[in-house]
Amino acid sequence: MIKRQKLKYKWMLITTLITFTTILLFCLIIIFFLKDTLRSSEIDEAERSSNDIANLFHSKSLSDISALDLNASLENFQEILIYDDKGRKLIQTSNDNTLAYDNKIDFKHPERIHIHRSHGINYLVITEPIRSKEFSGYSVLVHSLQNYDNLVKSLYIVALAFGLIATIITAGVSYIFSSQITKPIVTMSNKMNQIRRDGFQNKLELTTNYEETDNLIDTFNEMMYQIEESFNQQRQFVEDASHELRTPLQIIQGHLNLIQRWGKKDPAVLEESLNISIEEVNRITKLVEELLLLTKDRVNHNVLECENVDINSEIQSRVKSLQHLHPDYTFETHLATKPIQLKINRHQFEQLLLIFIDNAMKYDTEHKHIKIVTQLKNKMIMIDITDHGMGIPKADLEFIFDRFYRVDKSRARSQGGNGLGLSIAEKIVQLNGGMIQVESELQNYTTFKISFPVLN
């Protein structure tokens, strides 16, 4: 199993290796070119001395040339050896007594320039033939490369030291920098562990002055807010659903106990208890169906068969049916003169109409006047449903589409609602690309404005 590394150590290791490698390569390249330049300079210096010696033999005879004359043509750390044609050494002189070159020269196959190592020191050796009127032989110039080699070694040591110092500095800076970068990540990790232990607390308060990590913190805070909100909604949903199911179950249980005690002998009690129990079972069934509908997602919606629905005809059909059931209500319709086609599942649209009209009727028990308007405006299909009932307080407007939320909680059960209708309606509208707006004034009116885009 591969051992996991901390991000800051991994970051520090990578940046340090990259920096060290870069500096090392850079120094090696510089040393390579500098070494080549210095070597050329050493060769040029030896060439000049060798040429001066050759010119000296062309201007003077061998007997007139002294050791001082030869030394005057030499630079520091150089030695000159003069041989005749037979390879006999005639003169050997140097301006540096520390030179210890003792290699024999092969005059049959002489190399003009070569490097020879003697006693641990490299020497540049230049062999030149001398042909003058009075002398014929060879000059051998020995140029010590000890200073050159020492300088190159020093350059390597300096480069290595510089690389190590730069590496240490880079490692320190990388550690500090990576610690600053990973600090919000570590803090968020600790925060998540705290949330796991203690539940949701305050948001993460941290500023790093780095755009990426600050965005990460903002995203984390937003995500935690959404998770907390979702968690609270889920908890509230479970509590509300439990409450909604508990009430009819308690009623059913009470009437079953009543039947067990007296209903066996009293047909009236039996009939009443059975009717109430059936009504509560129907209420539970409807509640479960609506809860299942709310859990359906867009994938399930895509499976539904959609068709072009004439919304004016559907509204007229629903209003006609409701008028027969509720003759005491007035349904005022102002429908668009031209047919309006909406691509939607017909059952969903019928359910949508019934939810809004039923909701309007529940909260308009005094005037009993429901107004429905349709129009086509700015490539949008508009449906307005207005009641003249109790209205909705402004503080409640943002919550009316929440599950189990009721404006008038004291009257909700007597009106037969369970607080899921508007949540279902909102989901149907959203799944079909529409939107809902609400306008309301207390003790005056409430208008639900439903709009759908016109699709070609």
From Swiss-Prot:
It comes from the Bacteria. The chain crosses the membrane at residues 13-33, 157-177. The keyword Transferase applies. It catalyses: ATP + protein L-histidine = ADP + protein N-phospho-L-histidine. It is found in: Cell membrane. It comes from Staphylococcus epidermidis (strain ATCC 35984 / DSM 28319 / BCRC 17069 / CCUG 31568 / BM 3577 / RP62A). PANTHER family: SENSOR HISTIDINE KINASE CPXA. Keywords: ATP-binding, Cell membrane, Kinase, Membrane, Nucleotide-binding, Phosphoprotein, Transferase, Transmembrane, Transmembrane helix, Two-component regulatory system. The modification Phosphohistidine is found at H243. Its EC number is 2.7.13.3. Residues 179-232 form the HAMP domain. GO terms for cellular component: plasma membrane. Its main location: membrane. Member of the two-component regulatory system ArlS/ArlR. ArlS probably functions as a sensor protein kinase which is autophosphorylated at a histidine residue and transfers its phosphate group to ArlR. Autophosphorylated. One of its GO terms (molecular function) is phosphorelay sensor kinase activity. It is a multi-pass membrane protein. This is Signal transduction histidine-protein kinase ArlS. Residues 240-456 form the Histidine kinase domain.
